[in-house]
Amino acid sequence: MQETSLTKAVSPRQSLGQILLNYYQLTKPRLIVLFLITTAAGMWVAARGEVDPVLALITLLTGAMAAGSANTINCLYDRDIDYIMERTRHRPLPSGRVQPWEALVFAIALAVGAFSLQTLCANLLSACLEMAGIAVYVGVYTHWLKRSSTQNIVIGGAAGAIPPLVGWAAVTGELSWAAWVLFAIIFIWTPPHFWPLAMLIQEDYAKVNVPMMPVVDGDRPTAWQIFGYTLVLLPTTLLLVYPLHACGLIYGAIALVLGVVFIRKAWELVQTPEDKDQARAVFKFSILYMMILCAAMGIDSLPLTHAVVSQVTANLQTLVGTIL
């Protein structure tokens, strides 16, 4: 094969540290952090706040490995368009610091390691869910939809919604309705999280013919879609409180406040869809939203929290009884 910018040999002068950094960058570690947060939330809610620390550590480790595998394959598949876009052309594959076959071997090793370790230390269901996440992200999003549909991030977003299922299955060995609500929360959250970012970098997507919604439909229709998803997201988060009773009032109150703020910010974007600062504000808040929401799930699930809430409730009932 004729040598191109995408098939140049890796420089023999790279230090061990640079080589390790290359593979670390292939995994897109900043994306993995959010996956691990939602995995932990699933575990803590499923276990009512009493999670085996060893199981938690292993599940988070294998989750990071599985996500790293999926992200590496994504980098491998997209290396042609990454080379064209200025913000991505210096990544390990388009820059030639890592060869395609090396990235593929690395991705396979991560996937095999994740599946084996999770099966041995947790259970087969959670391990299979990790592999399903890889399959959906690579097959459905990266290969099928990313370059062909404006709904790429909506349908492909199912991959990012799988981590809480992994966490839940690791603890219980099954998937309850509450687990699927966690899946739905992440699934519905993904478009209003990603589309504001797509609005900011739509010129890059247009350059490489990736049909992200802002590129094809424009900023205003995209802003309305973002607003619509935030409206659906708020009641979905509250399903964990009622009727499922998987989370309590502390989580419910925080989810309500977060949801209202998210809706307000999305509405402000509808008013000024061409305002890049507003799109950036929605994107940044979406990350904060998910981090606080998952933290609220974890705190609400703790036995200490249940004890405090029960005691406060009992005291209030006694006070009301005394007054009446």
Swiss-Prot record:
Claim: Protein biosynthesis is one of the keywords in the record: no
A cellular component annotation (GO) from this entry: plasma membrane
Pathway the protein contributes to: Porphyrin-containing compound metabolism; heme O biosynthesis; heme O from protoheme: step 1/1
Record-linked InterPro entries: Protohaem_IX_farnesylTrfase, UbiA_prenyltransferase, UbiA_prenylTrfase_CS, UbiA_sf
Membrane spanning stretches: 31-51, 53-73, 104-124, 125-145, 153-173, 181-201, 222-242, 243-263, 285-305
Pfam family name, one: UbiA
Database matches in CDD domains: PT_UbiA_Cox10
Top EC class, one word: transferase
UniProt keyword list: Cell inner membrane, Cell membrane, Heme biosynthesis, Membrane, Transferase, Transmembrane, Transmembrane helix
Organism superkingdom: Bacteria
Gene3D superfamilies, A to Z: UbiA prenyltransferase
Family affiliation: Belongs to the UbiA prenyltransferase family. Protoheme IX farnesyltransferase subfamily.
Function: Converts heme B (protoheme IX) to heme O by substitution of the vinyl group on carbon 2 of heme B porphyrin ring with a hydroxyethyl farnesyl side group.
Protein's recorded name: Protoheme IX farnesyltransferase
UniProt source species: Cyanothece sp. (strain PCC 7425 / ATCC 29141)
